[in-house]
């Protein structure tokens, strides 16, 4: 639709040379270049605005899905907890609300979950100290004994 062939560009250049003249042609080309640059900048800005709106919409959809999944998991976990409690004592289960604000659920975005690898070196040392302390203070289970042998 907006295809510009080389022959059309040559025709426009010849007409511009004849109409504007060789003396003012460089200045005219600079003005045209500035206007084209402004048009490209405006187009890029407009396109980035649309991309940002699409990204925000997708993030809202993902947050809604996360809220639904968290509510389902919470309901399942509370249902399992109520089943074990009902076998030991007859108690009425509390109603589960679908409102995440009432459930005190904290949602995190994928950006909050990023880990800076440069800052994790001290975490590895703390982790080994913690596991050694925990392993010494708790009795070893057969699975843990096998895992400790594999690590050594």
Curated annotation (Swiss-Prot):
Task: Please give the family membership noted in the entry.
Answer: Belongs to the TatB family.
Record keyword Transport present: yes
- Physiological role: Part of the twin-arginine translocation (Tat) system that transports large folded proteins containing a characteristic twin-arginine motif in their signal peptide across membranes. Together with TatC, TatB is part of a receptor directly interacting with Tat signal peptides. TatB may form an oligomeric binding site that transiently accommodates folded Tat precursor proteins before their translocation.
Q: Where is this region: Disordered?
A: 60-152
What are the GO MF terms of this UniProt record? protein transmembrane transporter activity
On whether Transmembrane is a keyword of this UniProt record, the answer is: yes
- Keywords carried by this UniProt record: Cell inner membrane, Cell membrane, Membrane, Protein transport, Translocation, Transmembrane, Transmembrane helix, Transport
List the biased-composition ranges (Basic and acidic residues): 60-71, 141-152
Q: Name one GO cellular component term.
A: TAT protein transport complex
Q: Where in the cell is it found?
A: Cell inner membrane
Membrane topology is: Single-pass membrane protein
Oligomeric state and partners? Answer: The Tat system comprises two distinct complexes: a TatABC complex, containing multiple copies of TatA, TatB and TatC subunits, and a separate TatA complex, containing only TatA subunits. Substrates initially bind to the TatABC complex, which probably triggers association of the separate TatA complex to form the active translocon.
User: What is the recorded name of this protein?
Assistant: Sec-independent protein translocase protein TatB
Q: Which domain of life is it from?
A: Bacteria
Question: Where in the sequence does UniProt note compositional bias of the Low complexity kind?
Answer: 84-98, 124-140
Per the UniProt record, the lineage of the source organism begins with: Bacteria, Pseudomonadati, Pseudomonadota, Alphaproteobacteria, Sphingomonadales
């Amino acid at each position: 639709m907006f295809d510009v062939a080389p022959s059309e560009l040559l025709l426009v250049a010849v007409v511009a040379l004849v109409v504007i003249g060789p003396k003012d042609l460089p200045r005219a080309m600079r003005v045209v270049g500035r206007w084209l640059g402004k048009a490209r900048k405006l187009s890029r800005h407009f396109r980035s605005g649309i991309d940002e709106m699409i990204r925000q919409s997708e993030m809202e959809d993902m947050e809604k899905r996360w809220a639904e999944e968290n509510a389902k998991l919470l309901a399942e976990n509370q249902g399992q907890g109520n089943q074990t409690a009902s076998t030991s004592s007859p108690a009425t289960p509390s109603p589960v609300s679908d409102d995440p604000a009432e459930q005190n659920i904290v949602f995190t975005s994928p950006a909050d979950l990023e880990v800076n690898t440069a800052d994790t070196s001290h975490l590895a040392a703390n982790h080994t100290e913690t596991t050694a302390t925990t392993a010494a203070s708790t009795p070893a289970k057969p699975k843990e004994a096998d895992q400790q042998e594999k690590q050594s």
